[in-house]
A protein has these predicted regions:
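Conserved phosphate-binding and hydrolysis motifs of nucleotide-dependent enzymes
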Residues: 88, 100, 104-107
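Short hydrophobic/aromatic patch on the recognition helix
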Residues: 45-49, 94-95, 99
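Intrinsic disorder/low-complexity segments in short proteins, especially the signal peptide
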Residues: 34-36, 78, 100
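An amphipathic alpha-helical interaction segment
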Residues: 1-19, 36, 44
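Short amphipathic alpha-helical segment with a characteristic S/N-K-E followed by hydrophobic residues
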Residues: 45, 56-57, 61, 106-107
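Key DNA-contact positions within bacterial/archaeal DNA-binding proteins
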Residues: 43, 92-93, 108
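Helix-turn-helix
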Residues: 33-42, 46, 88
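Terminal helix-turn-helix DNA-binding modules in bacterial transcription factors
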Residues: 19, 23, 28-32, 51-91, ...
Length: 130
């Protein structure tokens, strides 16, 4: 059984790390970078993700990116390529593969099901990056 101080410390690390990911998901983030920023070792942060979040850093980052991508695709103002870039993917094909793995469908099919009238209904609008 872990000591309460250890649990509190790991919870704090996890919360700090997830806050950074939630804000900077489109950046080129790495576990080492986040560990430095929360003043922790790579291994301690891995443990925090595993024990507190029941996930890994990479899984969390991907989930945040995919959730944001789904939101953007639902707005219909951006192409799939633009969404890919806005959530941190340089290659749209890699984005599409990750999106399909996460959501069980392609970005285009997701958009068609979520957007009234389909992907070509209505005017195109520009969105500012968050």
């Amino acid at each position: 059984m872990q000591r309460p101080a250890t649990i509190r410390h790991r919870t704090s690390l996890f919360e700090e790390a997830t806050s950074i990911v939630e804000i900077e998901f489109a950046s080129d983030l790495s576990l080492d970078d986040i560990a430095r920023r929360v003043a922790s070792s790579r291994r301690q942060l891995q443990r925090a993700y595993a024990e507190i979040g029941n996930t890994t850093f990479r899984e969390h980052l991907t989930a945040v990116r995919m959730d944001r991508a789904a939101e953007m695709l639902g707005m219909r103002g951006l192409t799939v390529r633009e969404v890919a870039h806005r959530v941190g993917y340089r290659q749209p094909a890699q984005f599409a593969k990750a999106f399909r793995r996460h959501h069980g469908t392609s970005p285009s099919a997701y958009r068609s099901r979520r957007t009234p009238g389909g992907p070509d209904d209505g005017p195109r609008v520009a969105f500012e990056a968050a």
